[in-house]
Regions:
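N-terminal donor/sugar-recognition subdomains of glycan-related enzymes
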Residues: 1-232, 239-255, 285-298, 309, ...
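Classical protein tyrosine phosphatase
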Residues: 100, 265-279, 377
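Conserved acidic E/D residue at the C-terminus of a beta-strand in Rossmann-like folds
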Residues: 100-105, 278-281, 303
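Acidic, glycine-rich loop-and-beta core segments that form the ion-binding/anion-interacting portion
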Residues: 260-262, 269-270, 276, 286-287, ...
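Active-site/ligand-binding-proximal alpha/beta "capping" segment
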Residues: 309-368, 372
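Conserved phosphate- and dinucleotide-binding cores of soluble alpha/beta proteins
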Residues: 347, 356-359, 364-405
Length: 462
């Protein structure tokens, strides 16, 4: 087995399969046309007619010493450029993790053909990041969210492998640095620094235990219902929902319907009966959404264990079928009450709808009302939303522009929605066995979904 084959095998072992497959596809179908490497491990760039190193040993030693001096006792280091991989190999023994960012597939090929990094790749000591990989954001969020990384994110700095990269890849370095900062900020924003929310959630959970024990165990729901149907619709409460209501009513008998709590009143108003309604809020305001609940409709309410006890108690007294469900977060799993089952609730109720649909083995999950942006009138929700169609404009959350549905220009979103969108993209990317069909026909573009007309969707998957 060649050195390159060993390195690719290490990547394909679960370390970084997308890059492993990309390298394998390259060597099977292409050859290096821009770069080559000589017996002294110096790389020649045919485009700029220049060698990467003028004095290879001296330059590698310079960057080696420079990086070590700036990173005493650092658990990880980020470096742009794989070079000939000698610097990477030498530095790896000093850190728990070494992240190497590169945009040139040929440089990956040449470096991994000459230097055996298979042991470091398999152990996680070296992680190669292909900046052109479609799922690079997902990869970085998973890496940065690890316990031995999270606590040290404040020491992040991008180091450069060699002046060659500074000269010819300056824009790529800036772009990589921007991507890393965005993902670090997203990971940090997930933190609850003063634990107030966490403590409220745990307090609610302890108060909800009696009704959790009296009602349907979530695990039983999954065991009895998974795999029964192929297609479902997840109904969210964005401003685009209003226009989809007539079609939803027409085709409601053809699909299993998952509904976020805030959209429930609109469905009831139009005689649409969802199969599932989900809630995870630790405050009381969702009571506004459930004033018209009817036990005869047989809608099953899936409530997070952290849902406010007043909401749980209200629905229970109304004799509404419900399940108080544990989050898959570690504190709940440590209770070892596995007979009740766990669900990945995420931070937004829509996220819980998708993970429930995934747990029930739906193959086609259709999204409507998932705008994640303001509409042209500045509304954050549909017209008759119980808390006000412009409720998000009062929250003073920083706003930003993002790519619009269909790729047609940009729309105005805010930071919380933008974070949520990225988490959804992570979820969808991790579940590629499911067809996620975005039939919102408005709002922000969500990657790893197929944008499709809602009427066409209904006709195709009914």
């Amino acid at each position: 087995m060649t050195i390159l084959e060993k390195n690719i095998q290490a990547l394909l072992s679960g370390v970084n399969e997308p890059l492993g497959n990309k390298l394998l596809n390259f060597i099977q179908n292409k050859t290096c046309s821009r770069f080559n490497i000589d017996e002294n491990l110096n790389i020649f760039d045919k485009t700029h007619n220049v060698f990467m190193y003028e004095n290879l040993e001296e330059e590698i030693n310079f960057f080696y010493q420079s990086i070590l001096e700036k990173t005493p006792r650092y658990p990880f280091v980020c470096i742009y450029g794989i070079g000939n991989a000698l610097l990477i190999k030498n530095l790896a023994k000093h850190y728990k993790h070494l992240f190497v960012f590169e945009s040139e597939i040929e440089l990956f090929i040449l470096a991994l053909s000459m230097i055996d990094l298979s042991e470091e790749l398999c152990s996680g000591k070296i992680y190669l990041v292909d900046i052109k990989e479609e799922r690079v954001n997902l990869q970085l969020r998973i890496l940065f969210d690890q316990n031995d990384m999270f606590l040290w994110l404040n020491v992040y700095e991008m180091f450069i492998n060699h002046n060659f990269y500074k000269k010819y890849y300056y824009e790529e370095i800036l772009n990589a640095d921007k991507i890393i900062h965005e993902n670090i900020n997203l990971v940090i924003r997930n933190l609850d620094p003063d634990s107030k929310i966490s403590l409220s959630c745990y307090e609610n959970f302890y108060k909800n235990i009696p009704l959790m024990l009296k009602n349907i165990p979530f695990k039983r729901i999954i065991d009895e219902r998974k795999g029964l149907f192929e297609s479902c619709i997840v109904v969210c409460a964005g401003p685009s929902l209003q226009k989809q209501i007539p079609l939803l009513k027409k085709y409601q008998e053809n699909f299993v319907i998952f509904c976020v709590d805030g959209a429930y009143p609109l469905l009831v108003k139009h005689d649409i009966t969802p199969d599932y309604v989900l809630n995870l809020d630790f405050e009381e305001y969702p009571l506004e959404f459930f004033k018209e609940v009817n036990p005869e409709n047989k809608t099953l309410f899936i409530l997070a264990a952290s849902t406010h006890p007043s909401v749980v108690d209200y629905l229970y007294k109304k004799q509404i079928p419900l399940s108080v469900t544990l989050s898959d977060n570690l504190p709940y799993q440590n209770l070892h009450i596995n007979d009740f089952g766990y669900l990945e609730f995420g931070t937004h109720v829509g996220h819980a709808c998708y993970t429930l649909a995934i747990a029930l083995k739906f193959k086609n999950i259709i999204l409507i009302g998932q705008d994640l942006s303001f509409d042209k009138q500045g509304n954050s929700h549909f017209d008759s939303f119980d808390l006000g169609s412009d409720i998000d404009t009062t929250l003073n959350i920083p706003t930003l522009k993002t790519v619009a549905y269909g790729g047609l220009g940009e729309v105005l979103t805010h930071l919380a929605w933008d974070d949520y969108r990225k988490k959804l993209e992570d979820l969808f990317a991790r579940n590629s066995q499911v067809n996620f069909l975005n039939a919102t026909e408005g709002g922000a573009r969500i990657e790893f979904t197929k944008e499709i007309n809602f009427e066409l969707c209904c006709k195709k998957f009914k």
